[in-house]
Regions:
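Cofactor-pocket helix-loop regions in the catalytic cores of large enzyme subunits
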Residues: 1-196, 201-205, 216, 221-280
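Beta1-alpha1 glycine-rich phosphate/pyrophosphate-binding loop at the start
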Residues: 212
Length: 280
């Protein structure tokens, strides 16, 4: 009603959400409260010790129950230090790592063919047309992870249905973020991990927000108008652009930290420091 610009968001989840919807639709993800029942827990591209402490009691309980905790991350973090094993692929190569694991799982007959036939489509095409492209030596060359470690990881994960993957947002910010998400999501589908309460989850906390985006955005008030769209990752450019007409004169920030989390933080900070910008 005020004529405000709309924000194209989010910097976190767009690629992964699109990838997930293309594979599994709007289905419930695995629940972190089931982690204590797992034999293998993979913390993939996430730093839960620092940024997801609400999940850590469940992971610590799983370890106390004998679970193996694996962290997959190019970085060294507090979570990789906490894990029993740190696997370090090169940034952006997670899809190759996941497909290499899948090839080992299939070659060793660890996949749940009955589950795949009953609950999925396209799995035979993936095996016939793609997995042979990812032998261990090639995956090692792509990811930098030794072939023996890839095989060990695949066998550890594939040897039980009681497995849980906690995937995070970081990989989705690569140009192949959707492909990486899809490849990783194939792992619990091939092992049938969902049958034990395991599987994969990305968000651990969204269910607590209870936000209805339709009520929040109130598109019914547009009355046929098409508002200007500003991409969240370009907020700094929008705030600094002196040719933008009309200029952005007010900024409402909710549940976000653009001064620290957008790609060009220097530009965002300069824009937010404008004397003529009203920021809430």
């Amino acid at each position: 009603r005020m004529g405000a610009s709309r924000l194209e968001y989010t910097i976190c989840t767009a690629a992964g959400r699109a990838a997930s919807l293309s594979m599994t639709g709007l289905v419930n993800e695995a629940n972190i409260e089931d982690i204590p029942k797992m034999d293998v827990v993979i913390l993939w591209a996430t730093n839960l010790v620092t940024t997801g402490i609400h999940a850590m009691p469940f992971i610590e309980e799983a370890r106390a129950n004998g679970a193996k905790i694996i962290a997959i991350d190019p970085r060294v973090t507090r979570t990789t230090a906490f894990a029993d094993w740190h696997v370090q692929p090169r940034p952006g190569t997670d899809a190759a790592l996941a497909l290499g694991m899948l090839k080992v799982i299939v070659d060793r007959g660890l996949h749940d063919e009955a589950f795949l036939r009953e609950q999925t489509i396209g799995w035979e095409k993936l095996i016939d047309e793609r997995l042979d492209d990812y032998p261990l030596d090639k995956v090692e060359a792509i990811t930098g992870v030794p072939a023996a470690d890839i095989e060990k990881l695949a066998l550890l994960y594939g040897s039980t249905k009681k497995s849980f993957i906690r995937l995070n947002w970081g990989i989705q910010r690569h140009d192949n973020g959707g492909a990486m998400t899809r490849a990783i999501r194939c792992l619990p589908l091939f092992t049938g991990a969902m049958l034990t309460g395991g599987g994969l989850c990305v968000g651990t906390g969204n269910e607590m927000r209870g936000i209805d985006p339709v009520k929040l955005q109130r598109t019914d008030l547009l009355a046929g108008r098409t508002p200007r769209i500003i991409n969240m990752i370009q907020i700094g450019r929008a705030l600094e652009d002196k040719t933008l007409a009309p200029p952005v004169e007010a900024l409402f920030v909710w549940n976000s930290d653009p001064a620290n989390c957008v790609p060009d933080t220097a530009s965002a900070r300069r824009g937010m420091a404008r004397d003529d910008l009203f920021t809430v």
